[in-house]
Curated annotation (Swiss-Prot):
CDD domains noted in UniProt: AdSS (cd03108)
Protein name according to UniProt: Adenylosuccinate synthetase
Homology family: Belongs to the adenylosuccinate synthetase family.
Swiss-Prot/TrEMBL cofactor(s): Mg(2+)
Organism: Paraburkholderia xenovorans (strain LB400)
Active-site residues from the entry: D23 (proton acceptor), H51 (proton donor)
Binding site for GTP: 22-28, 50-52, 323, 349-351, 431-433
Chain positions recorded as IMP binding sites: D23, E24, G25, K26, N48, A49, G50, H51, T139, R153, Q234, T249, R321
Reactions it catalyzes: IMP + L-aspartate + GTP = N(6)-(1,2-dicarboxyethyl)-AMP + GDP + phosphate + 2 H(+)
Matches recorded under HAMAP family: Adenylosucc_synth (MF_00011)
Family annotation (InterPro entries): Adenylosuccin_syn_GTP-bd, Adenylosuccin_syn_Lys_AS, Adenylosuccinate_synth_dom1, Adenylosuccinate_synth_dom2, Adenylosuccinate_synth_dom3, Adenylosuccinate_synthetase, P-loop_NTPase
NCBIfam families reported for this sequence: PRK01117.1 (NF002223), purA (TIGR00184)
Record EC number: 6.3.4.4
Keywords: Cytoplasm, GTP-binding, Ligase, Magnesium, Metal-binding, Nucleotide-binding, Purine biosynthesis
Length: 448
């Protein structure tokens, strides 16, 4: 269904979150919903997660700038919960402007956003190299170390760039600490103070027109009737608190993070849309109970898993890493629904299951001989989970491009209906292909 064909209520706010380990297809859905939003907000993460959009057959990958930038007239916001690499930001702006997209007149960056500096990247990559086989799977872009500095109260913010003397003083203090770690513990080269200072201050004048009090601006435009769409990155099971720790990202990926990461009150969030693929994927290390295929693990290479990866084109949009694949895990989905307070689900990539003889759904686990119906909290316990499956007859008909529920194959509807039943909440949207209009709408998030 075309998003523009729906009338919605003004002044409503929707949060889009991934319910799995990221890569759920949030970018397409955010793009679809943006037809009814006047602003799109990033509230956590950095340029470590890519959102892939297919618009008019053209593929665009956005890593930092909100997906709404592809819609003329839509304001885009980077909140204080994001960690910002100016280098990555201006590279992305350059790519978009070269394609004719107006960016700098519509992009607003919180003055309180923490900066990613060269020493964060050096530490990130140095640590991962030192871990060897025990690596976490970081993208090496400095996101984690930047969040560490933020929590340790030594982070440098965007607003600090506009006070060069204070910035230089704090940068020198930070480098005294971080260069000791780099040279004495990680055994890599130190980061040069003057070069870093000159590079970072060179961004100040270019950033200044986009920097503002994002929290205040969001409050004002929403009060005036604008609909806001909060765009989560990564997924709930990668959340620093609620994910499969320590195999997680360094920020809170859950819906509640939209309030702290953008500076809005929780009562302003009207609807939480949870995005889930019709199967599961994971990139990098960490437990994965329903796993079928892992290119790096000979014991996890079932043919059906490779088929899901191949048909679903499961390669990271930023890293290019092959994703591990498995059946949809409803017990993990229930955990995500509870944590986020999900209002309704959007099921993506249903078409990847077309042609399978049978489809399985993990509805719980056996853990140390006990039945468990919810994903455990710790990685070691999750690693001991033995999936309990329900099996469904597959469908040979194609679901690609279907825009109405009743036109789905009967077996596909049966599978989706069971997912709703086990999840305990409705499926409000179904994606049947990569193009934005290949979408079934059952209940509109901006109208509920």
């Amino acid at each position: 269904m075309s998003a523009s064909a729906v009338n919605v209520n003004p002044g409503r706010n929707v949060v889009v979150v991934g319910t799995q380990w990221g890569d759920e297809g949030k970018g397409k859905i955010v793009d679809w919903l943006t037809d009814h939003a006047q602003g799109v907000v990033r509230f956590q993460g950095g340029h470590n997660a890519g959102h892939t959009l297919i618009i008019g057959g053209k593929k665009t990958i956005l890593r930092l700038i909100p997906s709404g930038i592809m819609h003329p007239g839509v304001a885009c916001y980077i909140g204080n919960g994001v960690v910002l690499s100016p280098e990555a930001l201006f590279k992305e702006i350059g790519e978009l402007e070269a394609a004719g997209v107006d960016v700098q007149n519509r992009l607003f960056i919180s003055e309180a956003t923490t900066l990613i500096l060269p020493y964060h990247i050096a530490i990130d990559q140095g640590r991962e190299a030192r871990r060897g086989a025990g690596k976490i799977g970081t993208t090496g872009r400095g996101i984690g170390p930047a969040y560490e500095d933020k929590v340790a109260r030594r982070g440098l913010r965007v607003q600090d760039l506009f006070e060069p003397e204070i910035f230089a003083e704090r940068l020198r203090e930070n480098l005294d600490y971080h260069n000791f770690v780099l040279t004495q513990y990680l055994g890599v080269a130190a980061v040069d103070f003057q070069q870093t200072l000159d590079t970072m201050l060179s961004y100040a004048d270019r950033l200044r027109p986009m920097v503002t009090d994002v929290s205040r601006r969001l409050y004002d435009v929403n009060a005036a009737g604008s609909n806001l769409l909060f765009e989560g990155a990564q997924g709930t099971l990668l959340d620093i608190d609620h994910g499969t720790y320590p195999f997680v990202t360094s920020s809170n990926c859950v819906a509640g993070a939209a309030t702290a990461g953008a500076g809005v009150g929780p009562q302003k969030l009207n609807y939480i849309l949870g995005i889930t693929k019709a199967y599961c994927t994971r990139v990098g290390s960490g437990p994965f109970p329903s796993e079928l295929y892992d290119a790096d693990n000979a014991a996890r290479q079932e043919a059906i898993g490779l088929e899901l990866a191949t048909v679903g084109k499961e390669f990271g949009s930023v890293t290019g890493r092959p994703r591990r694949t498995g059946w949809l895990d409803a017990a993990a989905l229930r955990r995500s629904i509870q944590i986020n307070g999900v209002s309704g689900l959007c099921m993506t990539k249903l078409d990847v299951l077309d042609g399978l003889d049978e489809v399985k759904l993990c509805v719980g686990y056996k853990v140390d001989g006990k039945n468990v119906d919810l994903l455990p909290r710790g990685a070691s316990e999750v690693a001991r989970c033995e999936p309990v499956y329900e099996t469904f007859a597959g469908w040979k008909e194609s679901t690609v491009g279907i825009k109405e529920w009743d036109k789905l194959p009967a077996n596909a509807r049966a599978y989706l209906s069971r997912v709703q039943e086990v999840a305990g909440i409705p499926i409000d949207m179904v994606s049947t292909g990569p193009d934005r209009d290949e979408t079934i709408l059952l209940r509109h998030p901006f109208k509920v």
